Amino acid sequence: MAFPPELTKDGYEIQFGTNHVGHALLLKFLLPLVVETATKLSSASEVRVVILSSIAHKFTVSSGIDFDTVKNKAERLSTFDRYGQSKFANAAYARELAKRYPQITIASVNPGAVKTGLQKTKAGGVLFRLYQAMFIPIIGVSPQEGARNQVWAATSKEAVSGEYYTPVGVAGNASAFAKSAEFGRKLWDWTEKELEGHRL
């Protein structure tokens, strides 16, 4: 989170490459087994994919994702815009994935402010560092508490495929742009093109 400008070894902006592209590639490799398992079970809700997003998905560039910045260091964007667009990709991709794989329950979740040390960074301005030092210790929850939303999405019969959940199991809080069918297709197409040629 809030990482300085850097690239993955595959040439993606570090946060986007780590939070979206890497996860999409792992999922590409796992999907055949996940789909096969879903077809063998009596209920699609028994097979789940939970994608970890963040409230930061709402704090991104005005276009949701600036695709011109995801294959370079994106130094013209703030570290929080870069993080936000990676988390935005998580929420939008989960929604699109759910449309394409209705036999699986797929949800994106915001774990909330969790005291993991993820926020301990030298990047960002004075206000963010003040937020880290003063508010996370007060409003943040333990990692065990922070895992509740993910566990809920992975197990609850009430989880709706394609939905974004805030703690715990609260739907309807995704940004309007993350719900855009047009943007979901655009992100899907971009991601599929990027993953071409990757094989196990």
Task: Give a label for each model feature.
Residues 189-200:
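C-terminal helix/juxtamembrane-tail motif
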Residues 86, 108, 133-175, 181-185:
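C-terminal helical subdomain
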Residues 33, 37, 156-157, 197:
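Generic structural signal for alpha-helix termini and adjacent loop/cap motifs
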Residues 72-74, 125-135:
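A short C-terminal helix-loop "cap" of Rossmann-like NAD(P)-dependent dehydrogenase/epimerase domains
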Residues 1-120:
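Rossmann-fold NAD(P)H-dependent dehydrogenase/reductase core
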Residues 94, 151-155, 192:
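C-lobe helix-loop cap of protein kinase catalytic domains
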Residues 92, 148, 189:
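Short, contiguous clusters of charged residues that form electrostatic/catalytic patches at enzyme active sites
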